[in-house]
Amino acid sequence: HFKNIQIVFNPEFLTEANSIEDFKNQNRIIIGGPRPATTKVRRIFAKAFPKVPIIKTGSTTAEMVKYFTNCFLATKVSFANEMYEISKALNIDYDKVTEYAVYDERIGKSHLNVPGPDGDFGYGGHCFPKDVMALKSLAWELGCSPRMLEATDSKNNDIRTNRDWETQIGRAVINIKD
């Protein structure tokens, strides 16, 4: 019935709080799928975002880029929260520690605020928790041992009070006009 349908995977890298601005100011666009379909989609994006790199790849690679990004940032949040706890135990200013640490450009400034933008510790929302759990599950199915993802998830479960993702199961589409 559907042999002429070609599906393209285009992961978004948006934050819930700034989704429209994030969309307008993308730093890259990933398009995964069969070549004829990705070529058509690339043309559409190239007109709207002429200065943004557009990367065409396979669907699985595009999906893994999304998981990699979200799981890396979730791990960074868990790590930052742990450094916050240690700084607090040493009676030193965590904000000064991060201010001086990010002089090393390899670290990057994002995702180091503790508590986070919602005033809670750890990460919430529906993307990071969902993606960490999904990639952990996939890794186990593939015979891999996702110890880092296990630690990230465990740390978050220990420190996060607002477990908002538990009430957002199945939420994938929002109406941005409201």
Annotate each PLM feature.
Residues 2-11, 15-110, 138-145:
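Internal alpha-helical scaffold of NAD(P)-dependent oxidoreductase catalytic cores
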